[in-house]
Amino acid sequence: MRVDLFDFDLPDERIALRPAEPRDSARLLVIDPNAENSLSDHRVGDLTSFLRAGDALVFNDTKVIPAQLEGIRHRDGAGGQQVSATLHMRTSPSRWKAFAKPGKRIKQGDRISFGHSGESCFLGSLDATVEEKGEAGEVTLLFDLSGPALDEAIAAVGHIPLPPYIAAKRPEDERDRADYQTIYAREEGAVAAPTAGLHFTPGLFEALDRAGIERHFVTLHVGAGTFLPVKADDTADHKMHLESGYVSAEIAARLNAVRERGGRIVCVGTTSLRLIESAAEESGEIMPWAGATGIFITPGYRFKAVDMLMTNFHLPRSTLFMLVSAFAGFETMHAAYKHAISTGYRFYSYGDASLLFRKDR
């Protein structure tokens, strides 16, 4: 499909720079393409009204790490140059793939010392070698540290990698360390939050428990590739960046039991959905799964296991707007976003939420 079919105009004032307080007071646009009135306006706190006892919410429990690194590039015969790197996928205990700027001036073999003046980890400076250089500013960094020592060093000198549409308007601050993390995050490795989960509070969890709605957790480490624009003119020519994760055998069995009892699988966030669909057989059975997924969902995709999706409002021409268009219908989602813009919904990572029912085949 032509990528420009997924374009729309979004006024700057619709981009949220801070989350709603409290989190579950954010607005919730319910989108049911199978209903006569497909759109209705609510609050996230109303979520239990649209779920049934025996349904299962699937959360992504990845935890955002301070993956934005600032440093100085060193090269024989050349002076130091300031560079930045956003880590997006770990490939070994001492290696990370990253998006580096300025990408054109970084070469294989360069040494980079990360951390501003006065910043250091408990073992000193955080240094790496550019082991490989790929396309679009992507590099493979081989750090001098490894394993837990590297983790602690990154935590000491790194910064929360705010999405570019927020970072362009304000700097990261201490509030973001809490705001840009779900209350159930536990598996470190993401460089972007699974933002649909940001709306959940302990009180909302209690309400879900009282309603008999199950909660299950999977892990997909969201990479910085989620923010990359689609530069191709046709979706067939776009290549997704890989993201690593897993679905345990225990969780797969529990979700299959939910489906067998007639319950619905409700994914909280596109990352949970992409992981479950990667793990599902054509029959809909969810299998234990571990690895890297580059699943790219566009209209025409046949969903195998997911019945409902809670997600924030996404960028024009993005792979995520393509995904929701595949899930609830292309025309329905364009109408929903038009309604959201005209009625003041807040967009993107810190914005409001939508609850989508899967379009009947």
UniProtKB/Swiss-Prot annotation:
Pathway: tRNA modification; tRNA-queuosine biosynthesis. GO terms for molecular function: S-adenosylmethionine:tRNA ribosyltransferase-isomerase activity. Its EC number is 2.4.99.17. It catalyses: 7-aminomethyl-7-carbaguanosine(34) in tRNA + S-adenosyl-L-methionine = epoxyqueuosine(34) in tRNA + adenine + L-methionine + 2 H(+). Transmembrane segments: none annotated. It is an enzyme of class 2 (transferase). SUPFAM superfamilies: QueA-like. Keywords: Cytoplasm, Queuosine biosynthesis, S-adenosyl-L-methionine, Transferase. HAMAP family: QueA (MF_00113). Belongs to the QueA family. Monomer. This is S-adenosylmethionine:tRNA ribosyltransferase-isomerase. It comes from Rhizobium johnstonii (strain DSM 114642 / LMG 32736 / 3841) (Rhizobium leguminosarum bv. viciae). The lineage of its organism: Bacteria, Pseudomonadati, Pseudomonadota, Alphaproteobacteria, Hyphomicrobiales. The gene is queA.
